[in-house]
Amino acid sequence: MSKIIGIDLGTTFSAIAELDDLGNPEVLSDPESGNRITRSVVYFGKDKVIVGEKAKDAAVTKRDKVVFEVKSQMENDVIYSLKDGKFIDDNGKSKGYTPSQISSLILSKLSDYTSKVKKAVITIPAQFADRARGATLEAAKLSKLDVELIHEPTAAILHYANMPNVSLNGRVMVFDLGGGTFDISIAKVIGKKVDIMTSVGDKHLGGQDFDREIIKILDKKYKKSKGKGLDDKDPVILDIAERIKKLL
């Protein structure tokens, strides 16, 4: 039987895992950096496209060529315009990259961590509408992956229910606080049998939203001190907000 990989295509970070010879999940590392998570960031250079930490670093000097948080655009009919340096309404006249095309670049980088595996399960937020699901499937198709989709908290329940020496009985609630969304799944679990009762989510409550609230506080203090506001799109400011969040 061919191997099947699991992919977390996240708003801020993404990851890929496969089962080892003993059937245990193993998160694969980026061969270049050694990190087990990859920044969901894409840099469109003049001669090449870069995905990951180096793409984030490029935003310091070439912000208009770097795409962040594409997952939050999956249900929108927009393109990322390199001319404008942002997502704009797709009126069919502008040249750019759709959210699916950008996501496919992230998926392609992740799938390069393993060899010749074309079947995958991708986790998605519980609140993803049909359009966002379709865009995710299109991204997988562009990266030549045959995929199935599963809600992120549901995947967590299935994992824990099937762990060795773990016995879950009764109703189980799993919270998934990600970079862009906050999801909850409730399941009835008896041994290894899992019956998902409901999955819901809030697409405006995630790590990036915390970052923005921190920037608002910093902006208020900076205005009081310097008489002018902060650029909330400045990669340096975004990085500072993320660091503060982690300290908290």
What are these regions (language model features)?
Residues 98-100:
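Hydrophobic alpha-helical hairpins/lids featuring a short glycine-rich hinge
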Residues 105-113:
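Short, well-ordered amphipathic alpha-helical segments that serve as non-catalytic structural scaffolds
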Residues 1-76, 80-82, 88-91, 95-96, ...:
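Oxyanion-binding/catalytic loops of NTP- or PPi-dependent enzymes
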